[in-house]
UniProtKB/Swiss-Prot annotation:
Positions annotated as WD repeat: 89-137, 138-184, 185-252, 253-297, 298-341, 342-401, 402-445
Lineage of producing organism: Eukaryota, Metazoa, Chordata, Craniata, Vertebrata
UniProt protein name: DDB1- and CUL4-associated factor 12-like protein 2
Chain segments carrying region Disordered: 1-48
Keywords in alphabetical order: Repeat, WD repeat
Residues spanning the membrane: none
Matches recorded under SMART domains: WD40
Family: Belongs to the WD repeat DCAF12 family.
Residue spans of biased composition, Low complexity class: 15-33
Encoding gene per record: DCAF12L2
């Protein structure tokens, strides 16, 4: 693979803390799930936890670690069902940044985010401290000036959490950073995309795929020689340098006869079990590729709801893709000709589904109206609020859909806000991104105002 190197006058970013216990490239779908997951209000001292494990093992007649693992699995399932109603919000101050589009947990304290104003930063959810990460620049740096206003739409960590993929200063280019230091490793700016990158998915620790507004998906392979430090730093002046790489494969999605100009790739999701890559395009189609050393398209399916299909996630346990649209979440099993799970309606005033994530049988839905909803795939219904009739009774369903309403965030009250929106005092934020840290039982949620002309942000830690 031909490589070129570029220097960047970047101060070295502080190393992020090791030991991340968070959701990965598919949000909830790949959360680590280490240890028993107890709601915070029900945590017990370690000695009491061990006693509970022992007694539970005796109760079911189990012996050894297998019994404990089974009980921990039960606890994890219980936590998945009960956690949403136990969460409370603490808003984070992001200053004047504009609309957070993407986020991922790096460890128990730090979340990396990308914004519409093309800012890549790490926020410490405990202290609120923000560290900006310099963006990588194309070999032809002037090209980035023509793409103001796009921003960073995707951030994904590889399975081992040693590499981070996102956009460069030019949103057409794929940037790869090393973790935990966030040193620049390489930039995919050669013979790649001709328009903005909207989505990224990792196929393995060294292979990533990007989806673009130009209607293509590109497969990138990171050379192992990049990791040995031989090209990581300029030996004389100490400037970080990075390789410039080209994709191993580029595939165009088929043109739909109904709207051939709107075949923009909006979201990607990878099935590790089947080694298949799913993609959603804005012309209302779902596409599936076999992902090996190259991409081989298997099928394209017309989606039942075709407007604003902007998010996609996959659940390995259920072998299901979930697609978020303007008013619905559709479920797809590419191996079934007849889909058995009916679409769910978000019923949020037509503001759309803006973010999705799976964990076990629960799907979390971030809406364009500033709320989080939780849907149980097995029961095929939304989680409901719980109400207790007395102190001695177990809480039961109250019959109302469980909805977490996010705070106001920050809104720039500029001329656009005054002239076009009448100076509305309350303006809900679209929840463009959310990610779970299951071992810490935390949920990071972020976004900003839905209208493109408004400038603002929201970020909150739910725990």
């Amino acid at each position: 693979m031909a490589q070129q190197q570029t220097g960047s006058r970047k101060r070295k970013a502080p190393a992020v803390e090791a030991g991340a216990g968070s959701s990965s490239s598919q949000g909830l779908a790949a959360a680590d799930g280490e240890g028993p997951l107890l709601p915070k209000k029900q945590k017990r001292p370690a000695t009491r936890r061990r006693l509970v494990h022992y007694l539970k093992g005796r109760e079911v007649g189990a012996r050894g670690p297998a019994g404990l693992q089974g009980f921990e699995g039960e606890l994890r399932g219980y936590a998945v069902q009960r956690l949403p109603e136990l969460l409370t919000e603490r808003q984070l101050d992001l200053g004047t940044l504009n609309k957070v589009f993407a986020s991922q947990w790096l460890n128990a304290r730090q979340v990396v985010c990308g914004t519409k104003c093309n800012t890549l930063f790490v926020v410490d959810v405990q202290s609120g401290h923000i560290t900006r990460i310099p963006l990588m620049r194309d070999k032809e740096a002037g090209l980035a000036q023509a793409h103001q206003g796009c921003g960073i739409h995707a951030i994904e960590l590889n399975p081992s959490k040693t590499l981070l993929a996102t956009g460069g200063e030019n949103p057409n280019s794929l940037a790869i950073y090393q973790l935990p230091t966030l040193d620049p490793l390489c930039l995919g700016d050669r013979h790649g995309h001709k328009d903005w990158i909207f989505a990224v998915a990792w196929l393995s620790d060294t292979v990533a795929v990007s989806g673009s507004r130009d209607g293509t998906v590109a497969l990138w392979r990171m050379d192992p020689d990049m990791f040995n430090g031989s090209i990581a730093w300029h030996s004389e002046v100490g400037l970080p340098v990075y390789a410039h790489i080209r994709p191993r494969d580029v595939e165009a999605i088929p043109r739909a006869s109904t709207n051939p100009s709107n075949r923009k790739v909006r979201a990607l999701a990878f099935s590790g079990k089947n080694q298949e890559l799913g993609a959603v395009s804005l012309d209302g189609y779902f596409h599936l590729w076999k992902a090996r050393s190259t991409l081989s398209r298997l099928l394209s399916i017309r989606l039942p709801y075709c407007r604003e299909n902007v998010c996609l996630t996959y659940c390995d346990e259920l072998s299901l893709y979930a697609v978020g649209s303007q008013s619905h979440v559709s479920f797809l099993d590419p191996r079934q000709r007849q889909q058995n799970i009916r679409p769910l309606c978000s019923r949020e005033g037509g503001t759309g589904v803006r973010s999705l994530s799976f964990y076990q049988h629960i799907i979390t839905v971030g809406t364009g109206h500033g709320s989080l909803l939780f849907y149980d795939i097995r029961a095929q219904k939304f989680l409901e609020e719980r109400a207790s009739s007395s102190l001695d009774s177990m809480p039961g369903p109250a019959g109302r859909k469980l909805k977490l309403a996010c705070g106001r965030g920050w809104l720039n009250q500029d001329d656009v806000w005054v002239n076009y929106f009448g100076g509305m005092g309350e303006f809900p934020n679209a929840l463009y991104t959310h990610c779970y840290n299951w071992p810490e039982m935390k949920l990071f949620v972020a976004g900003g105002p839905l209208p493109s002309g408004l400038h603002g942000n929201y970020a909150g830690l739910w725990s």
